Amino acid sequence: MTEEYYYTDNIRIKNGFMEYKSKETFKRIKSHNWHHILSEYGWEKIHLRWIIQLNRLSESKSKNSRYGTLDCDSDGDCFFHCIANALNEKERENDIIYNSDDIRNMISENLTEEQYDMIIGYYRIMKDADDFGEDWDPYQINSLEDFKQKLTTSGHEYWGDYILLQVLMNILKCNIFILNCNNYTNDFSIYNTLNDYNSNYDSIFLIYENNCHFKLVGYFDDKIISYFNDKTIPYELKTLYRIN
């Protein structure tokens, strides 16, 4: 059975390979030109500082980095958009399509009273310390249902943070890794999510840009991959995170 999926009118996956339309025929996208062609879909090469770091960890040096980022949107739902895009790659053959609202609702539906008490308590401590970055007051949230309503509101009301990251990882059975990319503070490091790698889970990698925006990380290997299993995580990322 032929696997065929179109990203755009000019870009498709066929039998595990990404192809682009050149005149009237399709040609395979290669490691030297992937970033030029997939820019039509929104992919671009990962920040130069991360290219340098990952190249240092590579067993085989490549003239063109295979690592890219996808800017999924900047409407306050960027974290949830990134997760949805990665899941859509996983569910492509099942014709299941997620959006940011689905991810918000997924967390809301699985949130327990105990988790709510822990989360809202922590937010109130942050508020007291003038370190709460959201535009709403956690002291105005009086119940789990109040918090769920806030959580499921699209846009800048609730961006998502590392506190809910563990909840989402357990729901999806997926590791979520975050790379800092801050041009202002010159911080290009691993963001510590305080979670250990689970080899039985799949994995998603994100870039956290300038402390305000998430982008999805992908790797080109015959096709762009942004949803990884233990075997498909690139060597450089496994080395960076010390994954055996």
Where are these regions (language model features)?
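A general marker of short, structured functional hotspots
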Residues: M1-E3, I13-G16, S22, I37, ...
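Papain-like cysteine protease catalytic cores
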Residues: I37-F188
